[in-house]
């Protein structure tokens, strides 16, 4: 479904209905992966969509069509620990495929612009 080049030169891939997120090196080696379920949690991976690399090196992952018992978005560390979850099934249902979390200069710029709107 989606892929992005990471700061370290690897590629992070959201597999859509493949129920996984995979980091692949330029040499085509899998260096990080979550598949089916986040280890040590009850979070099931469904239709994996958008991806974002945070400034701290963590990943934010979209988990569309996950149903009411799983988050639609979550942040995960390289140690595969969930930092936070967004689970608002009542609000977005299974339709939250893409999103963007703003931080740093980008967040400041958008915040400044929003303050000028009336």
Each model region followed by its residue ranges:
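Histidine-/acidic-rich catalytic cores in large beta-rich domains
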Residues: 1-118
